[in-house]
Amino acid sequence: MILRRGLVLALVVGAAVLASVLLRGGGHDNPTVARVGGEPITQKQLDPVVDHFRLEAKAEGKPFPDNGSAAFRRVRNRLLDLLVYRTELRQAAARLGVKATEVEVVRRLQGSGSAEPGEAIRDSFEYGSVEAQLLLERISAKVTSGIKAPTRAELAARRNRALSRYLARVERETQVRYEPGYAPGP
């Protein structure tokens, strides 16, 4: 009887541990590489950005570091920092009540000649770049709306300072946690 209870208890504990691992995102091929304010950035989000820059380097006839090398890890981690920045922008925009819709992003992509109709993919590097730019424009408009100045030059300078202060505060106050081996460095 005691052996049976022990076996049942072991099965229950084992199932709970397995469920916990699966619910936390472990046990699959898309590990979290960083968390921004609790929002995960996964390997499947990072890989296309790395691939984009690998292809850009190849198109320009420039070398790209080999996978697994120290130089590759430095480049990969800097690109992860870009994804962290974009996530911080999306979170800040949401707090301010501003957004960029998928339609707006695709229109901007098509207007810039970066994409053909139907070509813009939600997870593409170009899509993320345009989305971040639209969000930054809207964040800027929101946080600088009440600023006044005697000249256009002074107005631009005051707005730039206000936006810089806001973005510095966002970066300072947003909790970012990198998984081991992924933190950007010097």
PLM region spans:
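Short, low-structural-confidence N-terminal segments
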Residues: 1-74, 160-186
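Basic side chains
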Residues: 4-5, 76, 86, 138, ...
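Proteins with a high burden of low-complexity, intrinsically disordered sequence enriched in S/T/G/P/A and R
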Residues: 8, 115-119, 123, 150, ...
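Hydrophobic membrane-targeting alpha-helices
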Residues: 18-22, 92, 142
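A ubiquitous, low-specificity "background" feature that marks scattered single residues
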Residues: 20-21, 110, 132-137
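N-terminal targeting/tethering segments
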Residues: 27-130
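Acidic/polar surface patches and capping/hinge elements
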Residues: 121-125, 130, 137-181
